[in-house]
């Protein structure tokens, strides 16, 4: 689900013949339209919470999770209001520990940075049967699910490709 759904999408491209079925679930399809940017609109609170707890740089590989990023106030609205800018959010609260945050801020438009990270145009040479799964209440990656299904349909017309959509949220 989500990032692992993206990995499933990557793994089905020119896959080993023994792989007969895959199921990308709530996959990211294009970083500019999914997850933290919805058609370019920055999903601030979600990006802060998720990246702060999952995307911090580590000095070496570890099985330990990073501690979640601190919230200096229980009022999330006030936290972002006091920060004034997204640059200050990074400096004051994330302590520049989340490089992807700074990369997103440096690329507010769908430029080459975002385009080269999109997996959708690469969903060619897919041989396994595919079942893309998503939920109508997925706030993060609904775009990626539909676009992954669509890309597989268009780029691999002979592949058994189905879309399952239900009344659930992300994952």
Over which residues does each language-model region extend?
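Glycine-rich nucleophile elbow surrounding the catalytic serine of serine-hydrolase chemistry
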Residues: 1-10
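Active-site nucleophile loop of the alpha/beta-hydrolase fold
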Residues: 3, 23-32, 165-170
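Accessory cap/linker subdomain of secreted extracellular hydrolases
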Residues: 13-15, 20-125
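Proline-centered loop/turn at the N-terminus of a beta-strand
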Residues: 21, 129, 160-162
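Short beta-strand/loop motif that positions the catalytic acidic residue
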Residues: 126, 132-134
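Acidic beta-to-alpha connecting loop that harbors the catalytic carboxylate
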Residues: 136-138, 168
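Conserved alpha/beta-hydrolase "acid-adjacent" motif
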Residues: 139-146
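Catalytic histidine neighborhood in serine/cysteine hydrolases
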Residues: 152-171
